[in-house]
């Protein structure tokens, strides 16, 4: 089993999933992808990559609420045994009048992996509206926009001695800033908090996650706080 994200959760480094998929087939391994850090903001082609499973938390780039996620399962899992046992993932559970006829068989395909009470009347409509919005925005357009607003700020960071992965090997919606030895992470944190900038600190990286609600001025404000000028 090979399980990994489309991009690294700390600094946005992209993994070559096409080549990884090719290699997993050569050695007979399953490929399970965590799309939480990318799907919704970075295009993902299921037909091209053909993962055995793609799992996404709904609360990040899918713009949904906590407690919900989405998953795609390939043919390998069509007859699998789910982790969670409940009545609603059993065969014919949609026929409420016949629920007294207890079934031991699961629903076909991916339905067997649904959590109990998956017909959540509060959270599901929220996630559905979020997905409609993403389909209007389009992940490709999100990448193009975030690439445009981060280009100059990243150039300034690199010129000041900070490390950011080359754009060929990372997403534009998520990238990490790594510090030169001469810089103090504690001082940078103080400046960032003082300026009320929201970023994440993951290990020795400052994780930046711009979206359509940001602009270049937001990123330049961050650069000023990071560099200290």
Predicted feature locations:
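PLP-dependent enzyme catalytic core of the Aspartate aminotransferase-like
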Residues: 182-229
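Conserved PLP-binding catalytic core of the aspartate aminotransferase-like
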Residues: 147-154, 158-191, 195
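Active-site phosphate-binding strand-loop segment of PLP-dependent enzymes
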Residues: 1-36, 61
């Amino acid at each position: 089993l090979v399980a990994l994200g489309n991009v690294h959760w700390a600094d946005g480094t992209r993994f070559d999933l096409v080549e990884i998929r090719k290699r997993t087939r050569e050695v007979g391994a399953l490929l399970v992808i965590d799309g939480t850090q990318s799907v919704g903001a970075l295009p993902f082609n299921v037909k091209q990559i053909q993962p055995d499973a793609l799992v996404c938390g709904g609360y990040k780039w899918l713009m949904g609420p906590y407690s919900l996620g989405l998953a795609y399962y390939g043919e390998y899992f069509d007859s699998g045994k789910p982790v969670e046992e409940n009545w609603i993932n059993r065969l014919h559970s949609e026929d409420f009048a016949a629920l007294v006829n207890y079934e031991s068989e699961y629903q076909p395909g991916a339905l067997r992996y649904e959590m109990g009470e998956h017909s959540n009347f509060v959270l599901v409509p929220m996630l559905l509206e979020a997905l409609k919005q993403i389909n209007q925005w389009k992940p490709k357009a999100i990448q193009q926009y975030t690439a445009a607003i981060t280009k100059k700020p990243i150039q300034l960071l690199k010129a000041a001695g900070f490390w950011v992965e080359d754009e060929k090997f990372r997403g534009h919606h998520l990238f990490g800033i790594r510090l030169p030895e001469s810089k103090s992470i504690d001082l940078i944190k103080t400046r960032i908090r003082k300026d009320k900038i929201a970023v994440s600190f993951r290990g020795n990286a400052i994780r930046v996650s711009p979206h359509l609600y940001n602009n270049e001025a937001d990123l330049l404000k961050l650069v000023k706080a990071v560099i200290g000028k």
